[in-house]
A protein has these predicted regions:
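Sec-dependent signal peptide recognition
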Residues: 2-10
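Phosphate-group recognition and catalysis centered on beta-loop-alpha active-site segments
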Residues: 20-29, 107, 111-374
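Residue-level marker of positions within ordered structural domains that often coincide
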Residues: 10, 70, 83, 87, ...
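Extracellular/lumenal mature domains of secreted and surface-exposed proteins
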Residues: 19-122, 126-128
Length: 374
């Protein structure tokens, strides 16, 4: 995805004045002047220097660089480091000594190296010994806005193993975290995610516990970089564009750390057509579902068993084939660990589950950590 945006409207206004120009664009750009980057592919956090070719400082009255990530500079040859992997359009707005204003552009691809097992085990590797793990539903939303960077950070701080996040696409094809189709309930804005631009969504603030915060809706890349190397990610896609989601996960170097929730065999097939090694995470309701996904996915590591599939024959077949069980425990539930004295956690244990997704991640982690698995 090519970006030339400001993260939110306030930054847009500040960036405009930071370059000290209120000129409007002039005619066609001079054929001889060009923007050059010291590297057009660069790792996140690494510096890249931008220069104007075939022109001297004496030929220029001023220059404003827009790096495409909300940051700007008025230096003649600035250096910049990107913190989020993505593809960025860098724009140099140049006021020539003649008074003409021209725009020159270049593209920079920012990436992160794939996390290997020496940094953090892959999801299949982490499931191999079948120790109990906990997944924070929509992040740790009891202490931060759901589907937010701070909710991810809170889960990490509390030693939670997984987070579940929901991904949707904006009108201009950017991927953001949002469970509902609209932003009405979780931000101070209104409208469908699919009808709003990324910049529009970024101009609103997330709610927490009925109060407006200073936190914005994160992009998928921002969320992944917050999680990178610290917590596993279950991506629940509310869209069918698996390719776009996969590309961002790969660019963030998080393929081994993420699993992609699928509900249909065709969705799993679409993912595997992109990358046969991707961590497919099916939701299973019946034995036919399990059989279908097992025949399609080589070395299926984990499935989510809907409560309809909590049957001995289904579970035993999965477990005997080395498949770990993921189950919901106190998710969108009137019961809590306190009101039912952890009975639903005990049911999860008796069913042989490995990963418990919950709205009470800290409570379940403490409880399960005190149990020894047979």
């Amino acid at each position: 995805m090519i970006k030339a945006f400001k993260f939110f409207m306030l930054v847009s206004v500040m960036s405009f004045y930071a370059c000290g120009s209120d000129s409007i664009e002039g005619g066609a750009a001079s054929a001889s002047i060009a923007v050059e980057a010291s590297a057009n592919e660069v790792g996140y956090g690494e510096g890249v220097t931008f220069t104007l070719q075939n022109v001297t400082e004496s030929d220029i009255a001023s220059v404003c660089w827009d790096f495409g990530d909300g940051e700007t500079s008025d230096a003649f040859a600035p250096s910049h480091a990107y913190r989020i992997p993505d593809d960025y359009t860098v724009v140099a707005s140049v006021t020539l000594s003649t008074g003409e204003v021209k725009e020159y552009k270049t593209l920079v691809k920012v990436f992160a190296e794939e996390i290997n097992s020496t940094v953090r085990l892959s999801i299949p590797e982490s499931l191999a010994d079948r120790h109990y793990q906990v997944c924070a539903h929509r992040g740790y939303w009891k202490e931060a806005p759901e589907n937010s960077v701070s909710a991810i950070e809170k889960a990490i701080q509390n030693g939670i193993d997984f987070i579940e996040i929901d991904v949707r696409m904006t009108e201009d094809n950017e991927l953001v975290l949002m469970h509902n189709a609209t932003i009405d309930e979780t931000t101070n804005g209104t409208g469908k995610v699919s009808d709003l631009t990324f910049e529009e969504i970024k101009s609103y603030y997330l709610y927490f516990d009925g109060r407006q915060t200073m936190e914005h809706v994160p992009s998928l890349a921002e969320a992944l970089m917050a999680a990178r190397g610290k917590i596993y990610v279950d991506i629940d896609m509310k869209i069918s564009d698996y390719r776009s989601v996969y590309n961002i996960v790969k660019q963030c170097g998080m393929l081994s750390q993420c699993m992609f929730t699928v509900y249909e065999l065709q969705d799993a097939s679409n993912l595997l057509n992109i990358d046969k090694t991707v961590n497919v995470f099916p939701v299973v309701y019946t034995m036919d579902d399990l059989d279908g996904f097992m025949s399609l996915v080589d070395k299926l590591a984990i499935v989510q068993f809907n409560s309809e599939a909590w049957k001995n024959d289904i579970l035993e077949k999965a477990y005997s084939n080395g498949i770990a069980g993921f189950m919901n425990v106190y998710v969108n539930d009137d019961d809590t660990p306190y009101t039912d004295n952890y009975q639903k956690v005990n049911r999860f244990v008796s069913l042989g589950g490995t990963v418990a997704q919950t709205d009470f991640p800290v409570e379940l982690k403490i409880y399960l950590d005190n149990l020894k698995r047979d």
